[in-house]
Every structure is written in structure tokens, then in C-alpha cells.
A protein has these predicted regions:
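Short beta-strand-to-loop acidic/aromatic patch adjacent to the donor-nucleotide binding site
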Residues: 91-103
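Conserved donor-nucleotide/metal-binding helix-loop-beta segment in metal-dependent transferases, i.e.
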Residues: 102-137
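Short, charged/polar "capping" segments at the starts of alpha-helices
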Residues: 17-20, 45-51, 108
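Active-site-proximal specificity loops/subdomain of glycosyltransferases
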Residues: 41-92
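Short, acidic, metal-binding catalytic loop of nucleotide-sugar glycosyltransferases
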Residues: 25-36
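Generic structural signal for small/hydrophobic residues in well-ordered secondary structure
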Residues: 38, 99-100, 155
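N-proximal low-complexity "stem/linker" segments adjacent to membrane-targeting elements
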Residues: 1-27
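Catalytic core and acceptor-binding pocket of nucleotide-sugar-dependent glycosyltransferases
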Residues: 144-240
Length: 240
């Protein structure tokens, strides 16, 4: 079925006063993604003046009840719900682009045209939250797989198709939504088409930037959590 629009960029926010680096990254995203529709998604009980000043159009703000943004658990629950993806039904793809992400150049249409159902940075290095897990070691399930959700391109009809499974896993585990979607993708009979780790690394890098760039040989489309993982390293590749 043809879609009226190929892709929408959704930037989730939860606070009225983002830090200066988040504003810088947001201005960059608005500039680089200028030919694509951008939606700021946030609670209905905050002031958006700072985001408007950063270049977001008031008509591009989608406000939802505040309880969806009160904590990581609430946000994870939202991104496991069919209703969330249904908001964007006129689009084939949704790019989740969190405020701690940076885009180097606009390759969004090209990534959509590759036909994957889900693309995110691969888990090649053990994240801190997994290192510190005292109850259950999730790393064997994650290692080498594609799925980080901070910058992730998702085919909306596929997310809606499997959202009930995601909600069930979330109710059982309350883990991060990107890990929930990984569990769903590993179920027998579930088909969520993803690139391999090397291809996904060209879409987005999160951890170990120097090692990741040595592996890819070129700058990725985006980076996520760059202030946490390699802020000084990435400065050389970002305009002042």
C-alpha cells in the first residue's frame, strides 16, 4: 500500500528547559532534516518556548498526557504501544531521534529505501546499565544484535503488528523498550527485518566511537549519546 509520506522524524522531550548541548543538537536536526516533517513529542503540561526558539514550529508539537513522560518506565511503555505508532499512520517510517543524538548529513530517505523494518545502533560493546545488572545478565541476548532505540528507524505497520507482544514482554520485564523489541524480534514466527551489525553501525554509532569509526571507515549518518560516550572525540567532526 502506498503511503502519503515516507517518513516522519519524532523527537521525544520531557522537560521545558533542555541543556545547551541538547538545544545545539536540536537546531542541527532541524537544519539537516529540513526537507522532512519533524514532530516534537512531549507532555501537555510543560512550556515549549525554548523549543520554538530552536526552530520547532508550534504546529509540529504533539502533546500527550504528562504521565507518558514521567520517568523512563512510562516512556518505554509508550513506545511499546500500538496507539503510539497509530498517531503516525500516514507515514511508512518513523525515525525516533532523541535529544542526545547528532545527525551529520541527511541520508534518511536512502535508509528508508533499504526496506528494513527496524534499524538502530548495534550492541557491540556492553552498555553500562547491562554491566551493572545484579539480577539478570541481558548481554548474551544483546551482543552483536541491532536494536538501540535512541536513534532508530522503524516501519510503522510492523511495529503496530507486533505491539501486543511488546506490551506483554514489557508487563513481564519492564525493561527498556529497545530491548523489548529485540525480544519480540527473536520470537519464532516474528519477522522484523534488520541490517547486520556492520551496516547498522553506518546508520548510528553509540559507544566506543574511535573503534567504531575504524570499523566503518567513515562517519555514520548519526550518533547517539555522544556526550556520554566520546564527547571530546566527536567534537572534531562537529561544526562550532
Amino acid at each position: 500500500m502506498p503511503y502519503p509520506h515516507q517518513v516522519v522524524i519524532v523527537i521525544p522531550v520531557y522537560k521545558p528547559f533542555p541543556d545547551p548541548e541538547e538545544i545545539r543538537a536540536l537546531r542541527r536536526a532541524v537544519s539537516v532534516f529540513s526537507r522532512h516533517p519533524i514532530r516534537l513529542l512531549g507532555p501537555d503540561d510543560i512550556d515549549y518556548s525554548v523549543y520554538l526558539d530552536a526552530g520547532i514550529d508550534r504546529c509540529s508539537i504533539i502533546q500527550m498526557p504528562g504521565h507518558h513522560f514521567r520517568g523512563i518506565k512510562a516512556y518505554n511503555r509508550l513506545l511499546c504501544s500500538k496507539g503510539f505508532y497509530a498517531i503516525f499512520d500516514v507515514f511508512e517510517y518513523i525515525l525516533i531521534f532523541q535529544t542526545d543524538a547528532w545527525v551529520f548529513r541527511d541520508e534518511l530517505s536512502e535508509w528508508c529505501e533499504r526496506g528494513y523494518d527496524y534499524i538502530g545502533s548495534p550492541w557491540l560493546w556492553r552498555p553500562e546499565r547491562v554491566k551493572n545488572s545484579q539480577i539478570l545478565d541481558l548481554w548474551p541476548l544483546m551482543k552483536g544484535r541491532v536494536g538501540n532505540g535512541g536513534v532508530s528507524l522503524r516501519k510503522i505497520k510492523v511495529m503496530k503488528k507486533y505491539a501486543l507482544l511488546a506490551r506483554i514482554f514489557f508487563a513481564l520485564t519492564a525493561k527498556n523498550e529497545d530491548f523489548i523489541w529485540l525480544l519480540v524480534s527473536l520470537l519464532p514466527g516474528v519477522r522484523i527485518k534488520k541490517p547486520n551489525a556492520d551496516e547498522a553501525l553506518k546508520f548510528c554509532i553509540e559507544m566506543e566511537p574511535e573503534e567504531a569509526l575504524n570499523r566503518t571507515g567513515s562517519l555514520p549518518f548519526t550518533v547517539h549519546a555522544y556526550m556520554r560516550y566520546g564527547a571530546d572525540y566527536w567534537k572534531a567532526y562537529m561544526p562550532d
